[in-house]
């Protein structure tokens, strides 16, 4: 199929790395692996920080819609429109209308709907997301949490599940050589949930200063100085590795002993899958979408949300139990390479799309 791919929040071609950009790219790779021809049909970002900023986008949205309509007067039409991550701050203003005009299926992945926004100034954009979900031939959710949310808001919506995945090829190529006391984390340094996780991690490590550990941090961002400040009390124990390529990250993770990231507000967190693919057990919180990517008690330890002492205790437990740490690391690698690979995702995604097309 010819797939018109659109990510209203952040294009897969955006220069700034993020989980959203990575998942958009992974979806494209999975679609292509399944034999589909994928085109990113628009770079237009509808993401807006305020309702006022959203309203100001209207003229540009109209111009982009006109461009897209003209495009398919001259070029072969797509067989399907695929929208990744529409939600109230970044709805898809193009796909539903174009799909209807071209008589092709409209599909969403990771659509999100928060009913509490219905009573705010975001109500107009929220309504657009709801209409798109109801129009969709299928709405693909990556976590049970998201699927249940859509089902509750739109009982008649057509839903399907695709578990979070990564391209595991880079990790299959590296041989784990863990330093048992080396803690690893990979995360952007920005305000909000990321900063909250960094702060919680620093607090937890203060509770286990007497344990033999070092921490290697991969990532960068606008809050770099503030993040460094959180860990200023650990001289000689923190290694700042900055932003790295996918290949470098795979190699660095393979040298680690335990992956530590609290995961405050994480939709799911692809970095957890990358760490497990490299053979690292995970210590995270049982919060948001994290349980969708870590098998509690098998590939890692998940602690109660907000409990710093429990989180510190879980890190200490794995530091002190080499047999358990090694067993979890091996299970983690098997879990991702066998169940959460690009090949597996491509198969499932292809089945979902073909079924959706047949039902249209």
Predicted regions and their residues:
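Short hydrophobic beta-strand element within catalytic cores of glycosyltransferases
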Residues: 281-284, 294
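Nucleotide-activated donor-binding/catalytic signature segment of Leloir-type glycosyltransferases, i.e.
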Residues: 225-247
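Membrane-proximal helix-turn-helix segments that form the acceptor-binding/catalytic region
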Residues: 122-139
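Aromatic "clamp/platform" in nucleotide-sugar-dependent glycosyltransferases that forms part
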Residues: 264
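Short alpha-helical donor nucleotide-sugar binding micro-motif in glycosyltransferases
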Residues: 243-244, 251-256
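Conserved donor-binding/catalytic core segment of Leloir-type glycosyltransferases
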Residues: 175-196, 202-206, 216
């Amino acid at each position: 199929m010819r797939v018109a791919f659109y990510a209203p929040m952040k294009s897969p071609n955006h220069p700034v790395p993020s989980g959203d950009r990575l998942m958009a790219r992974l979806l494209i790779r999975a679609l292509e692996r399944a034999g589909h021809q994928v085109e990113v049909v628009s770079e237009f970002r509808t993401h807006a920080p305020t309702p006022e900023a959203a309203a100001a986008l209207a003229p540009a949205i109209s111009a982009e819609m006109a461009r897209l309509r003209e495009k398919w007067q001259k070029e072969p039409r797509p067989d399907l429109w695929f929208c990744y991550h529409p939600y109230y701050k970044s709805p898809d203003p193009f796909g539903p209308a174009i799909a209807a005009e071209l008589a092709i299926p409209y599909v969403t992945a990771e659509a999100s709907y928060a009913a509490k926004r219905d009573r705010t100034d975001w109500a107009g954009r929220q309504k657009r997301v709801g209409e798109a979900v109801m129009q969709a031939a299928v709405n693909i959710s990556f976590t049970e949490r998201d699927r249940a949310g859509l089902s509750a808001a739109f009982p008649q919506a057509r839903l399907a599940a695709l578990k979070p995945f990564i391209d595991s090829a880079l990790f299959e190529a590296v041989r784990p050589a863990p330093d048992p006391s080396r803690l690893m984390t990979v995360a952007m340094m920005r305000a909000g949930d990321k900063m909250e996780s960094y702060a919680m991690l620093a607090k937890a490590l203060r509770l286990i200063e007497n344990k033999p550990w070092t921490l290697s941090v991969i990532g960068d961002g606008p809050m770099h100085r503030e993040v460094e400040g959180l860990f200023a009390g650990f001289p000689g124990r923190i290694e700042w590795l900055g932003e790295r390529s996918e290949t470098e990250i795979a190699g660095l993770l393979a040298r680690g002993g335990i992956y530590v990231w609290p995961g405050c507000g994480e939709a799911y967190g692809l970095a957890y899958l990358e760490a497990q693919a490299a053979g690292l057990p995970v210590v995270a919180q049982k919060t948001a979408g994290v349980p969708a990517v870590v098998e509690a008690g098998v590939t890692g330890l998940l602690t109660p949300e907000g409990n710093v002492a429990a989180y510190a205790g879980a890190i200490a437990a794995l530091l002190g139990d080499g047999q358990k740490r090694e067993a979890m690391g091996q299970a983690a690698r098997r879990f991702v390479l066998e169940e959460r690979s690009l090949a597996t995702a491509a198969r499932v995604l292809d089945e979902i799309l073909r079924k959706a097309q047949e039902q249209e």
